[in-house]
């Protein structure tokens, strides 16, 4: 819950009424008694984090969810709600955030460190930057290419500069016997705080190809330094 679930009052964000009603509706539609993980998918500027935490805790105590997650909460918001979860002994396990080799916002914000220090996990969504971190654009990007708002900043120096960076990253991937997508996923998963990635595939062979990232999750310090230099320059 967190984004629009229905029109009108309490149809989005993370108040107690919204969280409870949204889950009840989802369980009914799915024909289930409970979910494994229930996410507050968006920080609510009009609801205290204490209320959100207490609502999520009650949902677990009522047997409707086994674990709790949050999504799109920054480092400060995450640290504060973790404090409430600890007081309540709520089984909070994960924050889901936009993160990929090009999009380092959560590193700069301190979210990765906050989760690591509290022994909590990160699930990365947009791990391939909506297709940018694949072989799709190695030969160039047309004017009709649309980039998700969360990654728009990566073309601040122009599409040609981005294509140059993608090819430089691809050269590192080839030296690792991986393609760019596989290395991008492996780069995320080599961090012990990152327990999973949310990636889609329109074809089975795309999924099978992505899974090969698991064959090599180890990076040398030189590889990591080269990647950082390319991305951050």
Report residues per predicted region.
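A short, structured active-site edge motif that brings together acidic residues
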Residues: 1-7, 96-99
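Active-site groove signature of glycoside hydrolases
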Residues: 27-48
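Beta/alpha (TIM)-barrel catalytic core signal, keyed to glycine-rich beta->alpha loops juxtaposed to Asp/Glu
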Residues: 47-232
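Short glycine/proline- and acidic residue-enriched helix-loop micro-motifs
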Residues: 7-10, 39, 149-156
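Short, small-residue-rich loop/turn micro-motifs
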Residues: 1-3, 34, 126, 201
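Short, acidic/polar
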Residues: 12-30, 78-82
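Short N-terminal helix-initiation segments at or just after the protein's N-terminus
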Residues: 12, 37-42, 66-68, 142
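Active-site mouth loops of central-metabolism enzymes
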Residues: 3-20, 41-47
